[in-house]
């Protein structure tokens, strides 16, 4: 069959691994979602993590674009030239605003670079998921995906088991974030819980 878009995650445990993956996949577009201390054991320093994550932005095909999370201070302070920014900051090219989080999901809006505002609803919960979705929305819009298709896609996304998964039982709601927690993930889960 014919495919228009191939999406893959590029994870790494050492400097140079994302460049190696770029040499194989030859991406034209890339999203860098975050840099944090959760990988310090293998990378030894935040600078090594930043360098490795930005290997994606620095190894895109000509004419491509890097989408960078402007909410992440490490990425913001090391922003590649020409990057398309996204996040909850007002100065991001694609700027998201969280409207509500409940056991039914999350409502938010995204301001596009042309100033238009688009409302979204997702089954995912948590402010961090709004930032992640904003990156996907930014790239989809940049690639001229139809607005309705973007909206419908965001609505259809369902939680991955054990990653801030809401489980509703009679008389209770369970927020299951047991997959592979780290300090920033735990903070995100507690922040989400505090919004209920």
Language model: regions and residue ranges:
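Conserved substrate/cofactor phosphate-moiety recognition/catalytic segment
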Residues: 1
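Switch II (G3) loop of P-loop NTPases
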Residues: 4-15, 174-180
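Short glycine/serine/threonine-rich phosphate/pyrophosphate-binding segments
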Residues: 14-18, 130-133, 183-186
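Amphipathic, non-transmembrane alpha-helical secondary structure
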Residues: 19, 23, 54, 58, ...
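Inter-motif core of Ras-like GTPase G domains
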Residues: 20-36
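Alpha-helix C-terminal capping segments
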Residues: 23-24, 138-144, 194-196
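Acidic, Mg2+-coordinating active-site environments of NTP-dependent enzymes
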Residues: 31-174
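AMP-binding/adenylate-forming catalytic core of the ANL superfamily
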Residues: 49, 181-196
């Amino acid at each position: 069959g014919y495919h228009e878009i191939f999406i893959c995650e590029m994870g790494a445990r050492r400097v140079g691994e994302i460049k190696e993956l770029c040499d194989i996949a030859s991406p034209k577009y890339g999203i860098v979602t975050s840099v944090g201390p959760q990988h310090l054991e293998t990378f030894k320093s935040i600078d090594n993590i930043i360098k490795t994550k930005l290997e994606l932005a620095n190894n895109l095909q000509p004419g491509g674009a890097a989408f960078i999370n402007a909410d992440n201070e490490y990425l913001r302070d090391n922003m590649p030239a020409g990057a398309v920014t996204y996040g909850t900051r007002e100065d991001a090219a694609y700027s998201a605003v969280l409207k509500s989080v409940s056991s039914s999901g999350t409502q938010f809006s995204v301001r596009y670079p042309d100033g238009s505002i688009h409302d979204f609803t997702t089954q995912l919960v948590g402010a961090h998921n709004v930032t992640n979705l904003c990156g996907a929305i930014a790239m989809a819009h940049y690639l001229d995906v139809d607005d309705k298709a973007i909206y419908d896609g965001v609505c259809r996304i369902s939680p991955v088991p054990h990653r801030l998964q809401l489980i509703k039982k009679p008389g209770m709601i369970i927020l299951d974030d047991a997959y592979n927690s780290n300090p920033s993930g735990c903070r995100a889960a507690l922040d989400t819980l505090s919004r209920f």
